[in-house]
Curated annotation (Swiss-Prot):
This is Small ribosomal subunit protein uS17. One of its GO terms (cellular component) is cytosolic small ribosomal subunit. The keyword rRNA-binding applies. The gene is rpsQ. One of the primary rRNA binding proteins, it binds specifically to the 5'-end of 16S ribosomal RNA. Part of the 30S ribosomal subunit. It comes from Chromohalobacter salexigens (strain ATCC BAA-138 / DSM 3043 / CIP 106854 / NCIMB 13768 / 1H11).
Length: 86
């Protein structure tokens, strides 16, 4: 029987690639303020495993949740959706 992949997938922008086989991805979301009814940008930074060191700063990437790889890394790079210009 085939196992289903129920892992969460997120898309974000690479903000750091200084580590070996690791990147930091910033995920932005919009949240409605409960009092002012205005939508505010909120962001989360996640450390992701990049086995091939293919992501660069500014790239838009897709990451997937996985088993904990280290103290900070529990996500892995799936693909580079869009490369940074320049």
């Amino acid at each position: 029987m085939a196992e289903e992949n129920n892992a969460r997938t997120l898309t974000g922008k690479v903000v750091s690639d200084k580590m070996d086989k690791s990147v930091v991805v910033q995920i932005e979301r919009r949240v409605r303020h409960p009092i002012y009814d205005k939508y505010v940008k909120r962001s989360t930074k996640l450390h992701a495993h990049d086995e091939a060191n293919q992501a660069r700063v500014g790239d838009t990437v897709s990451i997937e949740e996985c088993r904990p790889i280290s103290k900070l890394k529990a996500w892995t790079l799936v693909e580079v959706v869009e490369q940074a210009k320049g």
